[in-house]
A protein has these predicted regions:
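Basic/polar N-terminal segments that are highly enriched at the extreme N-terminus
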Residues: 1-9, 703-704
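Hydrophobic/aromatic-rich, well-ordered segments within soluble, folded domains that form packed cores
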Residues: 64, 68-70, 293-307, 333, ...
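Short linear, low-complexity motifs centered on an aromatic residue
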Residues: 76-92, 109-112, 117, 215, ...
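Composition- and surface-driven signal marking solvent-exposed, interaction-prone regions
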Residues: 218-219, 294, 316-317, 343-347, ...
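C-terminal amphipathic alpha-helical interaction region
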Residues: 507-704
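Active-site core of metal-dependent hydrolases
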Residues: 10-125
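Glycine-rich, acidic/polar active-site loops that bind/position phosphate-bearing ligands
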Residues: 125-314, 323-329, 333-570
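Flexible inter-domain linker/hinge segments
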Residues: 1, 10-18, 177, 181-183
């Protein structure tokens, strides 16, 4: 690989994007396909056949031998089935290469083999994948060769969504319709579409692959279940934005190139706070494309790490005692002609459309804080949220001094007359230029922060799909916009009505705004006084999916049916219980086969040392005896805690699948796991390093 990368030539070279379609498709076909992409017009089979043929020819030129409907079931990862382009051999023994419009538009994977939460029985196997033409197809190269990947939605035989993409597309249509109504009220007759724009900042850890293989907890669960803190962690703040090590730099270079080939706008890369932790952030894209790109990015991060002798960890909390990993979801609403509805301008107090959009979103987040919290619910996130590293589990909105002041003016006097300006920053060094500061600071502790012209939702877990949180954001915004438009369209005096509505929403939903320190213990108490929900675990958050409030919301905008919501809740409970069960069994396996034998071996060496030294000379052996007693005591505690965990784990199956089993796992199994970890981590600090059966935290996070 050469040192020089021609990014302009590389970018999108493996994507069947607009420029490729313009070049290869007949004009009529291209225009019809664009109408489908931009306006949702139905695509005829005649047009689909032409598109499929040209897509196949292009893919073959790129080295593809197979095609795949690439979709995102409710497993948390992508799925695909590869079919070759070849047809049955002809009489002369040769084959043709074929790909029809029908094969492009529809596939039939086995729906019974994916999570359905009761929507599909094992014998009800038929499911369909359907081409999402708004997200471009791409060719992916790996050891198997080239594969044409076609982004698709996945639904059951009876039409229920079994994936992440379908509800996301539905929610995008909902917010588009209602946002267009809103901007029409302000005289905008030219914009034809409003699209949620999303940029997902992806955090991850890199560790040496050989050391990863020696940690069964990492290989089975994605996180360390045991591990004592090394003498140094992240307390010196020297890793964040520090110099990137050569091995990691080479890795990042290849990650960027792989992303750029697939049209992923990988933009920013840097070291994160914890040792061995890093971040990759792209430029914004439409929400469905951003979700696809993030799934592709996670795969690239893992694949390239393996090539460089490393392992990429996407778990939210792979190491206790240092920061975990999240995925900040930056969300805004943009028209097809480039207007950002969340752009306040220089004088936000005069920007009435912006203030209406802003207060609608405050209303949406306040009304559906439980749903927004649930959209980030994940078993790994339970170990991350609420620490001094990630947002608290209470949803609140940070607006900053400028916007908070504007709203306070509206609430207290009924009129906003001014907006705070940013002052000039003077460094006191003549050779450094002075410049205007932003009107407000940032707040890294807020779960939902306004950051200039977008909202940044910081709760999402690092390995999770961003689809779910954007489904919620789009749908709750659509509801708030609809309710506002219903009132304003019927108002005799629009100017007066919109002013009153902004004031009403700002007043009624002021409790959701919090500009202080979200890490402070006092905030949890204040949030309780305000009546804000504090859903501290995944199990607490899941019921938000099936409340009558949620059902009414999602059914009104045709995003989910009641049955689909119930199925997703059941899947979430099942995922939680299975994940905890796997972690518990892994702890028991490691303790039985590695920890206890290693400690017995070490205490035997200590005992032999005591006897040998005593036999050789009349000297003090109190150090050896003290160490022997401590290790033996901790070994006994370890065995006792292991037995308690084994008992708790054995009873998991006694509880019905669903909420009861998940609650039991959280209340009993997780507690037993914590109690087993404590003596084992203490033992690690006492036992000879050469006898400890696995790499330490220091080995893992400081040796990449």
């Amino acid at each position: 690989m050469s040192d020089y990368t021609n990014v302009k030539e590389l970018f999108g070279c493996d994507v069947f994007n607009d420029s490729v379609m313009q070049e290869r498709l007949p004009k009529k076909v291209y225009k019809e396909l664009k109408k489908t992409i931009e306006e949702g017009k139905e695509l005829s089979m005649e047009i689909a056949d032409v598109v499929a043929h040209e897509m196949k020819e292009w893919a073959i030129e790129k080295g593809a031998t197979h095609y795949s409907h690439w979709f995102q079931p409710l497993t948390g990862v992508t799925a695909e089935k590869h079919d070759a382009f070849i047809t049955a051999p002809m009489d002369n023994g040769k084959v043709l290469l074929s790909f029809s419009g029908k094969e492009l538009i529809k596939g039939e994977p086995d729906a019974s083999s994916f999570p359905s939460g009761g929507l599909r029985a094992t014998f009800e196997a038929r499911g369909y994948t359907t081409w999402d033409c708004t997200s471009p197809a791409f060719v992916r190269h790996d050891a198997a060769g080239g594969t044409l990947c076609i982004p698709t939605a996945f639904c059951s035989y009876t039409g229920e969504a079994l994936d992440q993409k379908t509800p996301l597309l539905r929610s995008m249509e909902a917010v588009n319709k209602q946002a267009l109504r809103l901007i029409r009220l302000f005289g905008n007759t030219t914009s034809k579409k409003v699209t949620p724009s999303v940029g997902a900042e992806q955090e991850y850890f890199l560790i040496d692959k050989e050391k990863w293989l020696q940690r069964k907890d990492l290989t089975y669960t994605g996180r360390t279940l045991f591990g004592a803190m090394p003498p140094k962690g992240q307390e010196m703040d020297d890793h964040y934005l520090g110099t990137i090590r050569q091995r990691v730099s080479a890795y990042m270079k290849e990650v960027n190139e792989e992303c750029w080939k697939l049209g992923i706008t990988a933009k920013t890369q840097h070291n994160e706070v914890a040792p061995a932790q890093h971040e990759l952030a792209p430029i914004y894209a439409p929400a469905n494309i951003a979700a696809d790109h993030n799934q592709m990015t996670m795969r690239i991060l893992k694949k390239v790490a393996s090539r460089h002798g490393m392992r990429c960890l996407l778990h939210e909390k792979p190491f206790a005692g240092v920061n975990g990993s999240g995925k900040h979801n930056n969300w805004s609403l943009t028209t097809d002609d480039g207007i950002n509805l969340l752009e306040p301008g220089k004088t936000p107090h005069e920007n009435i459309q912006f203030l209406l959009v802003l207060t609608c979103i405050l209303k949406a987040v306040d009304t559906h804080a439980d749903l927004l919290r649930e959209s980030a619910a994940d078993v790994g996130n339970d170990y991350r949220l609420g620490g001094n590293e990630a947002p608290p589990s209470v949803i609140s909105v940070f607006l900053g001094e400028q916007l908070e002041d504007v709203l306070e003016q509206l609430i207290s006097t009924g009129v906003a007359t001014h907006s705070k300006k940013g002052s000039k920053l003077q460094t006191g060094v003549k050779t450094l230029p002075d410049f205007m500061k932003d009107a407000t600071d940032r707040n890294r502790t807020s779960p939902f922060a306004f950051t200039g012209n977008k909202f940044e939702f910081r709760m999402v877990g690092s390995r999770d799909s961003i689809s779910e949180c954007n489904v919620v954001l789009n749908t709750i915004a659509a509801q708030a916009f609809k309710e506002a438009c219903d009132r304003l369209e019927a108002a005799p005096d629009f100017a007066l009505a919109v002013h009153d509505l902004i004031k009403e929403y700002a007043t009624d939903h002021q409790r959701i705004v919090f500009n202080g320190n979200g890490y402070a213990p006092e905030w949890a108490e204040e949030a309780a006084r305000r009546g804000l929900p504090n859903l501290s675990s995944m199990v607490d958050a899941i019921p938000a999916l099936t409340t009558e409030k949620a059902v009414k919301l999602f059914e009104e905008f045709h995003v989910f049916t009641r049955a689909e919501l119930q199925s997703r809740a059941e899947i979430q409970y099942e995922i939680y219980a299975k994940a905890i069960n796997i972690e518990a069994k892994t702890m028991l396996d490691i303790t039985t086969k590695q920890i206890i034998p290693a400690v017995i071996k070490y205490t035997t060496v200590l005992a032999q040392s005591v006897n040998a030294v005593r036999a050789a000379a009349n000297v003090d052996v109190s150090v050896q005896i003290d160490l022997l007693e401590k290790c033996s005591d901790l070994l006994a505690k370890t065995k006792k805690a292991m037995d308690v965990l084994a008992e708790a784990d054995a009873h998991i199956a006694d509880y019905p699948e669903g909420r009861e089993r998940a609650v039991y796992c959280r209340e009993e199994v997780v507690k037993a796991m914590d109690n087993l970890r404590k003596p084992v981590d203490h033992l690690e600090m006492l036992v000879d390093k050469d006898m400890w059966p696995m790499p330490s935290y220091g080995d893992l996070i400081f040796e990449v």
